[in-house]
């Protein structure tokens, strides 16, 4: 199961204790204070990276703790600082405080770092307390505890193109054709059970970097109310630059293809109104099942019902129309 949300308790390291110690040298039988300070506890840092795609490495982990600072030593030696603990998370990670639900940070780019829990300060050794009136202090202080925080990490995938559609609309087959990869396909609902990322080469611009495409698990009517795979995956649509609606042009037993498109649009609108303003292309898939005259007739019907939308007819299975779709990607994303 794709792990895109976790709750975890983070504990920074405790500061090391200061110590009471005395100089013990041959010609100084009553040497002065010589106890060192404790080391600083390790902090916990969260860092985003492009090579990480989920929270899989933190599965079943309830808490993480940075290293404690070490106690001071004689000869005025300070204890070693605790090592920082760095959590590497994917781009697109939202960090929330579990108690307040406040968004602490949005890791939208590669290499962003945040110190989420600071290590405790080290305690003071008795040397620190030496004064002109107190030449032999016997006082030392313990290290301070590190910060503790319970946080929620939620991933919203960042991609150029997000494929959305009903189960069995042919999304995974089209994804495989576009990204030249192999995602499991099958004639049953929810073949795609987790978001899958791929790269679509730009065929019209030689030095254009590939587009990142995300195959989002199939949406069903009521997804915004958490039906089917529901809200867990609708949120991944938010971070895409362009939506590719994939509709089976032949429809299915329960509804017409035109009705499928209307429901898809409504689901996204109900989930978040501003998704209606996101750029989109409508891919009328599986044209290999229709005769040329039937294709044109259905396209004209879609254009009549949805006059403001951009349509492309294609077949993810045979590859027909995919070059045209790639050209549309270039036109819409190279701005």
Curated annotation (Swiss-Prot):
Residues 1-158 form the Obg domain. It holds the Pfam family GTP1_OBG. It is an enzyme of class 3 (hydrolase). The keyword Magnesium applies. It is found in: Cytoplasm. Coiled coil: none annotated. GO terms for cellular component: cytoplasm. Its cofactor is Mg(2+). Mg(2+) binds at residues 172, 192. One of its GO terms (biological process) is ribosome biogenesis. Transmembrane segments: none annotated. It comes from the Bacteria. An essential GTPase which binds GTP, GDP and possibly (p)ppGpp with moderate affinity, with high nucleotide exchange rates and a fairly low GTP hydrolysis rate. Plays a role in control of the cell cycle, stress response, ribosome biogenesis and in those bacteria that undergo differentiation, in morphogenesis control. HAMAP family: GTPase_Obg. This is GTPase Obg.
